[in-house]
């Protein structure tokens, strides 16, 4: 199915609504101000000025109103992105994406989210405020996460510190843990959305394809069909950007919980300030407590030990 998005002015919006008035259909979705249905084309207009055409006649109808908007369709479209070459118009396709956060933070969990965004919801998700999470504040991500969870089929996994440390002590690398979580989150989401299937799956790349699947060689169920890997994947499809936000929101919620237990606001990251805070907690509440809220194998542990 073809999907085309145009940016149109307020005047053109009025013309579009008049032209398709006889084909009007009611569509109750955030950001939608008009929708119409032709035998071979669905037309959706958004408050943002975006006009989306879907179906066999999308190109024909879009040509009436403007120039087709160019969208990123491969890793070369995003400066610095590395990984698989994506299909043309990938950004407009129905994609299941996954991303993780918390991997570089001494305190708190590692979280992974997988999110399915069908082509019909891409503009809705954009209307809800999704961008590359690195461009958004934590407070903003907390704010929009509930709407995103309600709008999309998804799975969010949290690997808390006790389990993380247990796996690490058994010889699991962080890369292996991430691969297992991505695979599980993708599998969960595919199960929830069945019998519908995505056109493609995009994983924000943290390991080469061969390394990733080697991590999963002992897993019973491995998601492999139509899977692409790319760095900066959150800029290549809104599904990964949404996954990044949901993973971050889950991480922040868990950090709130741990901060309440610790009696102070835990710092993010793994800086020297984190070392100082860790040493303070160690002196006051002991090694076992500190271990229960941290990724114990990080270098911060030994740095904090020297400060006690």
UniProtKB/Swiss-Prot annotation:
It catalyses: Endonucleolytic cleavage to 5'-phosphomonoester. The keyword Transmembrane helix does not apply. Manganese or magnesium. Binds 1 divalent metal ion per monomer in the absence of substrate. May bind a second metal ion after substrate binding. Residues 93-308 form the RNase H type-2 domain. Its main location: cytoplasm. Signal peptide: none annotated. A divalent metal cation binds at residues 99-100, 204. Its cofactor is Mn(2+); Mg(2+). Transmembrane segments: none annotated. The keyword Hydrolase applies. InterPro entries: RNase_HII/HIII, RNase_HII/HIII_dom, RNase_HIII, RNase_HIII_N, RNaseH-like_sf, RNaseH_sf, TBP_dom_sf. It holds the Pfam family RNase_HII. It is found in: Cytoplasm. One of its GO terms (biological process) is mismatch repair. SUPFAM superfamilies: Ribonuclease H-like (SSF53098). It comes from the Bacteria. Its EC number is 3.1.26.4. One of its GO terms (cellular component) is ribonuclease H2 complex. PROSITE patterns: RNASE_H_2. Keywords: Cytoplasm, Endonuclease, Hydrolase, Magnesium, Metal-binding, Nuclease. One of its GO terms (molecular function) is RNA-DNA hybrid ribonuclease activity. It is an enzyme of class 3 (hydrolase). Endonuclease that specifically degrades the RNA of RNA-DNA hybrids. Belongs to the RNase HII family. RnhC subfamily. This is Ribonuclease HIII. It comes from Lysinibacillus sphaericus (strain C3-41). The gene is rnhC.
């Amino acid at each position: 199915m073809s999907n085309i998005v145009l940016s149109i002015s307020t005047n053109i919006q009025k013309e579009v609504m008049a032209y398709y008035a006889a084909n009007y259909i009611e569509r109750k979705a955030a950001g939608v101000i008009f929708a119409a249905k032709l035998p071979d084309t669905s037309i959706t207009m958004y408050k943002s000025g975006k006009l989306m055409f879907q179906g066999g006649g999308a190109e024909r109808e879009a040509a009436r109103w403007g120039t087709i908007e160019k969208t990123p369709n491969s890793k070369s479209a995003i400066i610095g992105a590395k990984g698989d070459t994506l299909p043309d118009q990938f950004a407009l396709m129905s994609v299941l994406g996954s991303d993780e956060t918390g991997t570089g933070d001494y305190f708190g969990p590692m979280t992974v989210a997988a999110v399915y965004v069908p082509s019909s919801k891409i503009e809705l998700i954009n209307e809800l405020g999704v961008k590359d999470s690195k461009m958004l504040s934590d407070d903003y991500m907390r704010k929009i996460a509930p709407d995103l969870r309600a709008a999309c089929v998804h799975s969010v996994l949290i690997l808390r510190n006790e389990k993380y440390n247990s796996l690490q002590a058994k010889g699991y690398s962080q890369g292996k843990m991430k691969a297992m979580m991505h695979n599980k989150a993708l599998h969960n989401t595919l199960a929830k959305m069945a019998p519908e299937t995505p056109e493609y799956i995009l994983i924000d790349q943290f390991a080469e394809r061969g390394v990733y699947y080697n991590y999963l060689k002992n897993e019973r169920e491995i998601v492999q069909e139509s899977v692409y890997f790319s760095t900066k994947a959150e800029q290549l499809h809104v599904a990964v950007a949404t996954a990044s936000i949901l993973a971050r929101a889950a991480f922040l919620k868990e950090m709130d919980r741990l901060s309440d237990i610790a009696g102070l606001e835990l710092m993010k990251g793994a800086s020297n300030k984190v070392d100082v805070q860790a040493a303070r907690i160690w002196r006051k509440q002991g090694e076992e407590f500190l271990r229960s809220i941290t990724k114990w194998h990080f270098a911060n542990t030994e740095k904090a030990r020297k400060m006690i």
